[in-house]
Regions:
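Transmembrane alpha-helices and adjacent helix-loop boundaries
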Residues: 1-289
Length: 289
């Protein structure tokens, strides 16, 4: 009964959406593969990839600092995570958009001794660059916690064995702990990639309007039809997210190998054959006696 009710509700919703002129399906079809929308989707993917690459690298470094025996490194990492996890990403992106106004000029050199060069931030301003930096720095704080959880999942015996073999702390992390921690790190990282794809819609706060959400907003601002344009953007977000979810599924299955005690059919047959051999040997021994 419950399934029938749900099915009826779904059919009614689909029928209502298909016949509702407010959705503007003709406009939706017109702009679904518009060149501007495709370029915006490309910028969305580019922002996602670049921001995640930087975030993963910084996240690993921050996690190592957090787990380091050095008090200064641990403190710096903790403060970084406190700031970037404790403030909304939208607010951070607004600050990055105002960065050239806060720091009009950056001097490079040895403080109070010599200056090698200076950078005029207003001349170097790039909305795409600051959007990428803002997303990456925010995400790196979450990646640091994911990496730290993965490292903590590795048994202490592994670390003790590496130290007994004469490895330093950094060698132990690089050669022993991190490779084993990947099984725990990879699945949530896939979730973060999908989340990052959707978070790129917030870079209008910088403001950068070249990505998918910004492009649809520009187009709907001209033709005054925001609903079909939002449907276009949602379709592309769903399409890319679906592809990423499929990739995440296979990646999780790959890294979960050996984590489960469930045997394959081939392994069960081999075990049965081995048991039969043992039984046959036992029977022969009994007959000889």
């Amino acid at each position: 009964v419950a399934a029938a009710i749900v099915l009826i509700l779904v059919v009614l919703f689909v029928y209502g959406a298909a016949t509702n002129p407010a959705y503007g399906w003709s406009t939706y079809g017109k702009y679904l593969f518009d060149s501007r929308i495709l370029v915006g989707a490309g910028y969305t993917l580019l922002l996602t990839v670049l921001a995640m690459v930087i975030a993963v690298i910084l996240g690993v470094l921050l996690a190592i600092m957090r787990l380091s025996p050095n008090v200064v490194l641990r403190s710096v990492s903790w403060v970084y995570l406190w700031i970037f996890r404790g403030t909304p990403v939208y607010v951070q992106l607004v600050f990055w958009g105002l960065f050239p106004s806060i720091y009009k000029r950056i001097d490079l050199g040895i403080p109070f001794v010599v200056q090698f060069a200076h950078l005029n931030m207003q001349d170097l301003y790039s909305a795409f660059l600051f959007a990428m930096i803002g997303l990456a720095l925010n995400e790196s704080a979450y990646m640091a916690e994911i990496v730290r959880a993965g490292v903590s999942s590795v048994g202490e015996g592994q670390t003790e064995a590496s130290i007994a073999l004469g490895m330093s702390w950094s060698q132990t992390m690089r050669r022993t702990v991190l490779p084993q921690a990947m099984r725990v790190i990879i699945p949530p990282t896939g979730n973060e990639v999908i989340s990052m794809l959707k978070t790129t819609s917030l870079v209008v706060a910088v403001p950068f309007t070249g990505e998918l959400f910004g492009v649809q907003a520009d187009i709907s601002g001209v033709n005054f039809q925001p609903i079909p344009l939002l449907m276009v953007a949602s379709t592309w977000y769903l399409a890319v997210t679906s592809v990423l979810m499929v990739g995440q599924f296979y990646l999780e299955r790959y890294y979960s190998r050996g984590a489960s005690r469930q045997l394959t059919g081939r392994q069960l047959k081999a075990m049965a054959a081995a048991q039969n051999k043992v039984l046959a040997v036992d029977e022969e021994s009994d007959e000889r006696r």
